[in-house]
Amino acid sequence: MDLFSPAKLNLFLKLHGKTSHGFHEMTTLYQVIDFGDRLSLESSSEDSLICNLPELNTPQNLIWKSIQVFRDYTQIYSPVAWRLYKCIPIGSGIGGGSSNAATALYALNQHFQTQLSNDVLQELGKKIGMDVPLFFSLGSALGIGCGEEILSYDNDHRDERYVLYFSDQPVLTKDAFSYVRPEDFSKREECLSLYARNNDLEQSVFRFRKDLEEKKHMLKRIWSPFNAHVRMSGAGATLFVSYSREIETDPSTAKALHATIHNSQGLLVNSLRKYNGWFEHGDNLLATTRQ
C-alpha cells in the first residue's frame, strides 16, 4: 500500500490565551495542499521504518507513535514495514510529521481491515499530536481549542493558489510558543470572516528569527503587483503567498506572475480535497526537502 501524505497550511492562526495546563488556545483555519510525502506499508516479519532522511529513522518518528496508539486500541500486533519518502521540510510549519502520523493510522486501518470509523481515527490522532486530527477531515477544517478540535469547514478560498517559500533553518514549535507575549493574543470573534488572514505566531517567531521577518518584507515587495497576501504557516519556518486564480485569466498577468514564482524560487501548490477515503496526489513532490 502506497499513500500520499499531504502538507497543510494555516490560512490564519489566532491565539486567545493560555489554558490552565499551560497550552495556548487558538482558532485556526487549516487547508490541506497537493504537496507532500509518500508513505508505503506492507506486512513483515518485524517492524521497520526506512526513510530517505536518515535522521528520521528514529524511535521518535511519529509513525511509531501511530503504531503504538493503533495497537493499544485494536490489540493487533502483527509487524509491519514502512517506507517514507520525505519531501516536506522538517520544522517547516506545514504539518509533515502530523501528516505522516495520520497517514500511518489510515494505512493501518486499511491494511488490517479494522474498519475504524473516521471519528475514531480522529480521536486516536489527538493522542499523537495537535495537527494529526486535521487529516481526517475532507481537507478544509477549523481548528479550535489547542488546534486539535476539528470542525468541518467549506473553504471559500478554494479559488486561491499558494506559493511556498521554505527556509534552510527549521523552527521548533516549542521555541515559537515560548516567545509568545500577552500582547500577541487576539480576541475571539463570533464570525470567522472577522478574523484577519494572518498568523499571530509571526510576532513571536520574528523575535528570534529576524531573517524570516526580512524575508516576509521582501516577498511582500515582489508580490505587490498581484494583490497577494504573504504570511507564515503554523509555527514556521515556511512563508507562503496566496492569490486568486482569477488573476491568471489575463495572459500577460499570468506570465508575469509565473515569472515571479520562478525567479523567487517559490513552489506553486493548490488546495486538496479528500475523495474515496484518502488524499490522492502524486505530482507535486520534490526530490529534496531542503530548499
UniProtKB/Swiss-Prot annotation:
Cite the entry's keywords alphabetically: ATP-binding, Isoprene biosynthesis, Kinase, Nucleotide-binding, Transferase
GO BP: isopentenyl diphosphate biosynthetic process, methylerythritol 4-phosphate pathway; terpenoid biosynthetic process
Q: Where is the active site?
A: K8, D131
**Which superkingdom, per the lineage?**
Bacteria
Molecular-function GO terms, alphabetical: 4-(cytidine 5'-diphospho)-2-C-methyl-D-erythritol kinase activity; ATP binding
Q: What is its EC number?
A: 2.7.1.148
Q: Which reaction does it catalyse?
A: 4-CDP-2-C-methyl-D-erythritol + ATP = 4-CDP-2-C-methyl-D-erythritol 2-phosphate + ADP + H(+)
Q: What class of enzyme is it?
A: transferase
The biological pathway it contributes to is:
Isoprenoid biosynthesis; isopentenyl diphosphate biosynthesis via DXP pathway; isopentenyl diphosphate from 1-deoxy-D-xylulose 5-phosphate: step 3/6
The protein's role, per its UniProt record: Catalyzes the phosphorylation of the position 2 hydroxy group of 4-diphosphocytidyl-2C-methyl-D-erythritol.
Task: Write out the similarity annotation.
Answer: Belongs to the GHMP kinase family. IspE subfamily.
Which protein, by its recorded name, is this? 4-diphosphocytidyl-2-C-methyl-D-erythritol kinase
